[in-house]
Amino acid sequence: MRVSIETLVENARVLRSRIPESVRMLCVVKADAYGHGAAKLAPALSGVADAFAVAIVEEARELREAGIRQMIVILGGACEESVREAVRLGASQAVYEPEMLMELEDEAKKLNVTAKAHLKVDTGMARIGVRGEDALKALLDAWKKCPHVEMEGIFTHFCVAENDPEFTEAQNARFERAIQIVRAAGYSPIAHAAASSAMLNPRYQHDMVRAGIALYGGGMPEVPELQYAQTLISMPIRMETIEPGDTVGYGRTFTAARRTRVMTLPIGYGDGYPRLLGNRAEVLIRGRRAPVIGNVCMDMLMVDVTDVPDAAVGDTVV
């Protein structure tokens, strides 16, 4: 797998140029930066990103070890030990239950530091987050007893921003009501709701937007400048010619209609290549496209290179 850090940084600059200067941009680098390598990517993005987001505390630790000193928001829930480590790392933990607050308070008090948290509001995802005004007010009551915990942010997540504007608007209205309640209680957190699918809509930008899949080149066709940054590369390990009527792979799902030159690549679904791409995908070899034939195996796949007569073992295949 080849990853272009330069392409990812340029994607971040493109996204940054599309939002107002007053709106912060948080770059989501969870799941090892969507498989692109968070420890290498985050430092390269530090000049563009105002903040970073991860899913779990282990990912926050990796960023700190890579030299990231900016805001790191842990978007997911956490057990007690993870919450305490977030305090030690200076990372901002998503909070939606009083018990989490107390764990942050206890650890921060012990270390004589101020813990940071982002209040998560469930506006319709039904995943994690405080749900309803009564629960929110109860959490705020608990927060008053936690002087060592700063409410750095408040956030929610839209679940159908791509194709259901009515429900997204309803979610945003619930979020704005939650912000109103929180600010009336004396807090001034950074508000953020929009991920990639909504980050260019001024109504949903609030104080900060979260660039996730768009950062990696996907999910935003309205910004054609965004480019994918991963290239999957392999090399053939075998060439063989089969006759008309011969079949290829498990299930015999491909039958040769002509004398066919078959190239075998040492990559399969065990390496993350989707099994469903058998008889559907194409590869690029010597500048020409060639179809994947037969079912994708666990660690191999086959390609019809009959129309690429100069293809050979040792070639680079994309």
Give the residues covered by each predicted segment:
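Active-site anion/phosphate-binding pocket segments in diverse small-molecule metabolic enzymes
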Residues: 1-9, 17, 32, 56-59, ...
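Active-site-proximal beta-alpha core segment in soluble small-molecule metabolic enzymes
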Residues: 2-3, 7-10, 23-190, 205
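Mobile, glycine- and charge-enriched loop segments
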Residues: 13-16, 21-23
